[in-house]
């Protein structure tokens, strides 16, 4: 996990600027410095040798060794910490134990307590194929996986059936939905339960009436001498059939999908239970004559028998009957196998018993088809006794037929019973799940519960923050909080997007100088309150709405136009480090403490300076030997084209908005043994009078850093007008102390003294011109030049910015 250094702590890391991702060289150095690597999976730390993940280079851990950029690392892991050589994966820690053991031993086993589906997901994430599972775990894994897939498939079908029944595009959707729940879901309400009970009573009543109509005592003879239904029972039959018809029509009208309604098995049963009654009435009323009635009598009897199918309507409200139907549909392969075994046995034993009994006296086995009945009742162990063998050979065949029947029937039963039990339990579980889901839906509609996935909430919060930053990116940008992770992937995606939207010539320092226009205290408060870890969805939406309503502030004007006044109560602490020179120490106030600059090296920590700091600790400066600072005034810069100026040597341009000297002063590097200073009025002072324009010589180290786009950034220093005069702070030899811009604002600017800081030779970087504190510049001589008898201080810019000074390195 990439951590931020605490304030005041100077950590010797590969990159001290926390607002930038680590460079590939730093990542490679971190990996090569240690033979071991720390892998943090879900908070559980594992420490292994680098050669362990290298054994499987195509897996996720194997690719970790080859990732040398920030983006590639975040594609493999979720977070990392180069300082501790630690890589974080937000995955199940228990499953990773088995996976890491596979890297070490080459044996992959599945943990007993883990779900098969979860194990499969973990194997897919780490890039390991399930074929590497050992034989002792493969059977259990595939059995559980098949079971889980079947349950998920059934649940998906149930959910799809429920989701497919939408009423949005139909007429009166609310009323139709309520009527459908009333007729199809008995557990949805009390009225639905009452309606289901009444429907079941009509089914039972019609079945009883159908049975009583067959009693001779209750039948009546018609004019042709044929028995007819009892009139009272006929009225009961008519009422029951009217109820069934009304129920079927209401169910059809409330159904969103008519074709799906007709194909439903329970609806087909309802239709077959209703049609025979109307067909019987039509046939009997349309054929009044004796001859016609005799022709349709048998057809009418068949349709009357079909009324018994009404008993199957009970399956609509019975989970057990639905389980039986599901078992028959699911086990049709096993049932077909059972019927095939029985058919083969019947054919074999009926043929054997026929040839064994055909010569016996008064035998009943007259043919093989006549022997089918005996083989069937014998194999099913029924044995009516109406037909049986009499010879010894025939009895032997009968014994073998009984044994074969027991084996044939008993073997498929264990295959058929478990699906019935499982489906019954599954139906009960689904009923409870449906109730729970409906309760959650009602709670969500009422606003009493908010269901949100944590990862979805975090991703949504990050999207809202990115949109908010883009909306306000024209004028200001919030500073990174000290508690937030600076290696957040979404943050770098936004940074890349911001760079791509700008021009190709817009460098990193220009972006950061725009960011630094906002008050640092205000940024800290906003960032701490808008961190995605501490915001709910409502607060994020409010934040987005507020930011989109705010008007963008005007950007800094490089032409020297006056910026809007900022509040006077603005104070910013600048952390500095002691710079020791042979002649004289830095002039700072007594009673203050200096903190290491690298602890707050972010660009956003102060508003007036934008610079880059080196990775190594700063050391006291030796006497300048290579390059020195020289100031010259060209004859006329007003007519010079800006494009031609940009092509000139590196210079420091001092544009004064007000004052007697309104010219542009150019500071350039030249091997001249002089020191340049500027008095309070802006006049130039030098050892040779007005400086002549000459060619500037650059330090040999300056070319080493130009190849790095992240380090070749310009330095901007904003100066402020005089606010009065104050006594000069005497130089102090005590330890450096913190200096604030509020203290400088009370001091009259009298002298600009700059110093050229050199980095350590091991870094190979050219020296940077430090502008974060008051300093002085010395030549190669041991003492100060007599032309400059005094050291004067110049304050840093605060809320007002009058001019801009730029050093292009």
Curated annotation (Swiss-Prot):
Organism per entry: Canis lupus familiaris (Dog)
Pfam families assigned to the protein according to its UniProt record, in alphabetical order: BTB_2, Ion_trans, Kv2channel
Glycosylation sites per record: 287
Annotated localization: Cell membrane; Perikaryon; Cell projection, Dendrite
Activity regulation info: Inhibited by quinine at micromolar levels. Modestly sensitive to millimolar levels of tetraethylammonium (TEA) and 4-aminopyridine (4-AP).
Region (Disordered): 1-22, 503-534, 549-571, 681-742, 757-809
Tissues expressing the protein: Expressed in smooth muscle cells.
Sequence ranges on the Cytoplasmic membrane side: 1-190, 255-265, 318-332, 425-809
Entry's Gene Ontology BP terms: action potential; potassium ion transmembrane transport; potassium ion transport; protein homooligomerization; protein localization to plasma membrane
PTM: Phosphorylated. Phosphorylation at Ser-608 of the FFAT motif activates interaction with MOSPD2, VAPA and VAPB.
Protein name: Potassium voltage-gated channel subfamily B member 2
Intramembrane feature ranges: 369-380, 381-388
Catalysed conversion reaction: K(+)(in) = K(+)(out)
Gene field: KCNB2
Subunit structure: Homotetramer or heterotetramer with KCNB1. Heterotetramer with KCNS1 and KCNS2. Interacts (via phosphorylated FFAT motif) with VAPA and VAPB.
Comp. bias (Polar residues): 523-534, 694-711
Protein's membrane topology: Multi-pass membrane protein
Motif mapping: FFAT: 605-611
Residues spanned by motif Selectivity filter: 381-386
Family: Belongs to the potassium channel family. B (Shab) (TC 1.A.1.2) subfamily. Kv2.2/KCNB2 sub-subfamily.
Extracellular side of membrane: 213-232, 285-296, 355-368, 389-395
Modified residues (Phosphoserine): 448, 608
């Amino acid at each position: 996990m990439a951590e931020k250094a605490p304030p005041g702590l100077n950590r010797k890391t590969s990159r001290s600027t926390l607002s930038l991702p680590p460079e590939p060289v730093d990542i490679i150095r971190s990996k090569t410095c240690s033979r071991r690597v720390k892998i943090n999976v879900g908070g559980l730390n594992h420490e292994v040798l680098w050669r362990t993940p290298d054994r499987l280079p195509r897996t996720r851990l194997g690719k970790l060794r080859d990732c040398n950029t920030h983006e590639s690392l975040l594609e493999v892991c979720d977070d990392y910490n180069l300082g501790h050589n630690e890589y974080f994966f937000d995955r199940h820690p228990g499953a990773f134990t088995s996976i890491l053991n596979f890297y070490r031993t080459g044996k992959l086993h599945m943990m007993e307590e883990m779900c098969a589906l979860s194990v499969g997901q973990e194997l897919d994430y780490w890039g390991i194929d399930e074929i590497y599972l050992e034989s002792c775990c493969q059977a259990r894994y595939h059995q559980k996986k098949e079971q889980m897939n079947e349950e998920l498939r059934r649940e998906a079908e149930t959910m799809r059936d429920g989701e497919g029944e939408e009423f949005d595009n139909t007429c009166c959707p609310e009323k139709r939905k309520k009527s459908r729940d009333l007729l199809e879901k008995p557990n949805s309400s009390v009225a639905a339960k009452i309606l289901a009970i009444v429907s079941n009573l009509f089914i039972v009543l019609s079945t009883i009436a159908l049975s009583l109509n067959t009693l001779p005592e209750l039948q009546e003879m018609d004019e042709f001498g044929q028995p007819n239904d009892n009139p009272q029972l006929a009225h009961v039959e008519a009422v029951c059939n009217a109820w069934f018809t009304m129920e079927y029509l209401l169910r059809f009208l409330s159904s969103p999908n008519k074709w799906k309604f007709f194909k439903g098995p329970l609806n087909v049963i309802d239709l077959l239970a209703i049609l025979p009654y109307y067909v019987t009435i039509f046939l009997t009323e349309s054929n009044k004559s004796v001859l016609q009635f005799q022709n349709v009598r048998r057809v009418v009897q068949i349709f009357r028998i079909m009324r018994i199918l009404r008993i199957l309507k009970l399956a609509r409200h019975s989970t057990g009957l639905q389980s039986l139907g599901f078992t028959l549909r699911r086990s049709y392969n096993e049932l077909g196998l059972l019927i095939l075994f029985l058919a083969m046995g019947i054919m074999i034993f009926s043929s054997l018993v026929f040839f064994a009994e055909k010569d016996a006296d008064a035998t009943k086995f007259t043919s093989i088809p006549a022997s089918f009945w005996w083989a069937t009742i014998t194999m099913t162990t029924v044995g009516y006794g109406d037909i049986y063998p009499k010879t010894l050979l025939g009895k032997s065949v009968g014994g073998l037929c009984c044994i074969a029947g027991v084996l044939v029937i008993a073997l498929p039963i264990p295959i058929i019973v478990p699906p019935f039990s499982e489906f019954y339990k599954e139906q009960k579980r689904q009923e409870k799940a449906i109730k729970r889901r409906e309760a959650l839906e009602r709670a969500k509609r009422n606003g009493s519960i908010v269901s949100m996935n944590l990862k979805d909430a975090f991703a949504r919060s990050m999207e809202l923050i990115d949109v908010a930053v883009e909306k306000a990116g024209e004028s200001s940008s919030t500073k990174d909080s000290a508690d937030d992770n600076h290696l957040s992937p979404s943050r770098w995606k936004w940074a890349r997007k911001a760079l791509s939207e700008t021009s190709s010539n817009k460098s990193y320092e220009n972006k950061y100088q725009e960011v630094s226009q906002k008050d640092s205290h205000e940024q800290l408060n906003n960032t701490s309150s808008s961190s995605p870890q501490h915001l709910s969805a409502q607060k994020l939406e409010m934040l987005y709405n507020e930011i989109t309503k705010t008007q963008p502030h005007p950007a800094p004007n490089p032409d020297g136009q006056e910026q809007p006044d900022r509040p006077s109560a603005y104070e910013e602490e600048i952390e500095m480090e002691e710079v020791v020179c042979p002649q004289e120490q830095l002039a700072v106030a007594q009673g203050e403490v200096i903190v290491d600059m690298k602890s707050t090296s972010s660009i956003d920590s102060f508003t007036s300076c934008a610079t880059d700091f080196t990775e190594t600790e700063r050391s006291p400066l030796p006497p300048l030997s290579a390059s020195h600072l020289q100031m010259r005034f060209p004859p006329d810069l007003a007519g010079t084209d800006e494009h031609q100026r940009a092509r000139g040597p590196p210079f420091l341009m001092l544009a004064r908005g007000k004052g007697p000297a309104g010219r542009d002063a150019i500071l350039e590097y030249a091997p001249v043994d002089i020191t340049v200073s500027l008095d309070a009025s802006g006049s130039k002072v030098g050892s040779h009078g007005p400086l002549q324009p000459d060619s500037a010589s650059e330090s040999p180290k300056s070319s080493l850093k130009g190849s790095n786009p992240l380090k070749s950034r310009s330095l901007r220093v904003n100066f402020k007008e005089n606010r009065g005069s104050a006594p000069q702070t005497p130089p102090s030899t005590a330890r450096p102390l913190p200096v604030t811009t509020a203290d400088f604002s009370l001091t009259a600017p009298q002298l600009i003294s700059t110093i050229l800081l050199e980095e350590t030779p091991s870094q190979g970087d050219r020296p940077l011109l430090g502008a974060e504190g008051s300093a002085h510049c010395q030549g190669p001589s041991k003492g100060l030049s007599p032309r400059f008898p005094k050291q004067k201080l110049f304050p840093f810019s605060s809320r007002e910015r009058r001019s801009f000074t730029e050093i292009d390195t």
